[in-house]
Regions:
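Flexible "cap/lid" loop of the alpha/beta hydrolase fold
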Residues: 1-5, 9-39
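Conserved alpha/beta-hydrolase catalytic His-Asp/Glu region
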Residues: 24-26, 44-96
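Short beta-strand/loop motif that positions the catalytic acidic residue
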Residues: 100, 106-108, 112
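Conserved alpha/beta-hydrolase "acid-adjacent" motif
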Residues: 113-119
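Active-site phosphate/pyrophosphate- and oxyanion-stabilizing loops and adjacent acidic/basic residues
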Residues: 121-122, 151
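Catalytic histidine-centered segment of alpha/beta-hydrolase-like enzymes
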Residues: 135-150
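C-terminal alpha-helix
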Residues: 152-158
Length: 158
């Protein structure tokens, strides 16, 4: 909310694979993840997060690592995850987007299965002086998969 509440503090803004308010895609995803977390099924949760975040090409290379990933980093409990998921479920800044005054770059993935590509388009349509870039064929993890992601962001910020 910094760019909304204090626009003079922000010269340029990048919003990547995000949304301003709930949509059916994120509601469905979050409800599934919340159920897995409540059940304590870390393995199924991590696999579902990966399957919904990465492109098919990426997943083909890394699916064989699922058994290892499901054992690494398992939390003692899911309270932190549940708190973050609840915050995502109640977040709504849509009506305030017109208060963002600085040049803004919205980046999304055309195949985003978590927040949807439409969420990126919606953001870009509501923010004036906004540039939209959708990575074709990539999803929510576009920031990890696109080789030019960091350079694109840096070029915009410079």
């Amino acid at each position: 909310y910094l760019a909304i509440d204090h626009p003079s503090f922000v010269d340029r803004l990048v919003l990547a694979v995000t949304l301003s308010r709930q949509n059916a895609t994120v509601q469905n995803v979050l409800s599934g993840w919340l159920e897995l977390a409540r059940q304590g099924d870390y393995k199924a949760l991590m696999i579902d997060i990966a399957e919904k975040s990465y492109s098919d090409a990426y997943l083909k290379k890394y699916r064989r690592l699922y058994p290892i990933l499901s054992k690494i980093g398992k939390p003692k409990d899911f309270r932190r995850f549940l708190t973050q998921a609840d915050a995502c479920a109640s977040h709504n800044a849509y009506a305030l987007l017109d208060r963002i005054l600085c040049p803004t770059l919205v980046i999304g993935g055309s195949c985003d299965k978590i927040v949807s590509a439409a969420a990126s388009v919606e953001l870009a349509e509501q923010i004036r002086n906004c540039e939209l870039y959708l990575y074709e064929g990539l999803g929510h993890a576009a920031y990890e998969e696109a080789p030019d992601f960091n350079s694109r962001v840096m070029q915009f910020l410079m």
